[in-house]
Structure formats: C-alpha cells, structure tokens
C-alpha cells in the first residue's frame, strides 16, 4: 500500500489536547479522493500480490507488523497521548500491546480459515472455497485508534483483502 498526498480544501490542523499546541497539518479529503483510494486499492487487490499470496506469506507479514508495533511501542504510546489525549499509563499498558496481540492472532488465522464441510451422500462433492472479496473500508474511531485499527485491519488483511483507512480527524496520527 501507499499513503496518498491529495486533499482538498483547508488542511486539518492537528492540535494536542494536552496543551493546545499545533502538532501538524493533514490533507482533508472528499468523495473523489475516497473514490480514488478505492480504485487504487482495487487495482492492488486485482494484481494479486497480496490477495493471491499464500496464507503463510500473509501470516509472516502480519507477524512482522506485530513485531514492529512491539519494537516501537513506547513511541506509539507517546504518539497516542499527544494525538488524542490517552492517559499515559493506559497508552503504555493497553494500546500497542493489544494491537500487536490482535495482529498476531489474525496472522495465525491466515492458514486456518478453511473450515470443514458436513458429510455428503455418495456421488456428491461438497466444497468450501474461501477467497478475498476485494476492498474493505475501515473507519477508525478516535478512542484507541491503534488497537481498534488492528481489530479492523487484522481480519481484512489476513483474508487477503485490500484496505482503505479513514482515520478520525481528532486522532489522525
């Protein structure tokens, strides 16, 4: 995937809820920008690099992502405190660790989602064929965005889908 610059209208000013200081400015989006993001995500899905990757490959990528979340847990916790005012103890205890655990859970799901079928009569072939469906839109809330983002991204990516994320304006970092 990739982050898109784009944006329309006035930028969204990211203000620290702690002291009111200006953290950064982000591009604002509109329906056309969302449509473009979905088109790009669909093209990425259709090229098959992720959607047709063997489950073991997706599993390895999700585990690597969890490793990176854990390795950068302190920085991510501080970012959550500065961005949306998460209480510092909660930020360190809950969010990065929960996000990493969620990503690891779905990494392990990658090669275990094939299920079983009920017995069928002689001469009848029963099958389950599971495949990614395409592009998933994930709207991330302001409260615990890293953790809840992992709840949405983990299952979608584990199944081979592409994802377009809509972060909250009040916790967009």
Question: What are the residue ranges of the model-derived segments?
Answer:
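Glycine-rich loop-to-alpha-helix module at the N-terminal edge of alpha/beta enzyme cores
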Residues: 23-113
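Residue-level signal for pocket-adjacent positions within structured domains
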Residues: 18-21, 45-48, 83-86, 108, ...
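Terminal low-complexity tails and localization/encapsulation signals of metabolic enzymes
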Residues: 1-26, 60-64, 113-139
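Residues that cap or flank secondary-structure elements
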Residues: 8, 68, 91, 144-145, ...
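Conserved small-residue-rich beta-alpha loop and adjacent elements
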Residues: 116-173
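Single, functionally critical "micro-switch" positions that shape active/binding sites
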Residues: 15, 53, 159
């Amino acid at each position: 995937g990739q982050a898109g610059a784009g944006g329309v209208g006035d930028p969204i000013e990211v203000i620290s809820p702690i002291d009111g200081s200006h953290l950064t400015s982000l591009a604002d989006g509109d329906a056309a920008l969302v449509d473009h993001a979905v088109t790009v995500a669909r093209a990425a899905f259709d090229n098959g690099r992720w959607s047709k990757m063997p489950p073991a490959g997706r599993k390895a990528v999700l585990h690597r992502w969890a490793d990176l979340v854990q390795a950068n847990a302190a920085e991510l916790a501080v970012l959550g405190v500065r961005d949306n005012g998460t209480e510092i103890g909660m930020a360190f205890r809950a969010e990065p660790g929960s996000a990493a655990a969620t990503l690891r859970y779905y990494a392990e799901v990658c090669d275990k989602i094939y299920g079983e079928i009920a017995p069928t009569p002689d001469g009848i072939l029963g099958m389950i064929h599971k495949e990614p469906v395409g592009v998933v839109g994930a709207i991330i809330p302001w409260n615990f965005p890293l953790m809840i983002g992992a709840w949405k991204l983990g299952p979608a990516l584990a199944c081979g889908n592409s994802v377009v994320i809509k972060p909250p304006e009040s916790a967009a970092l």
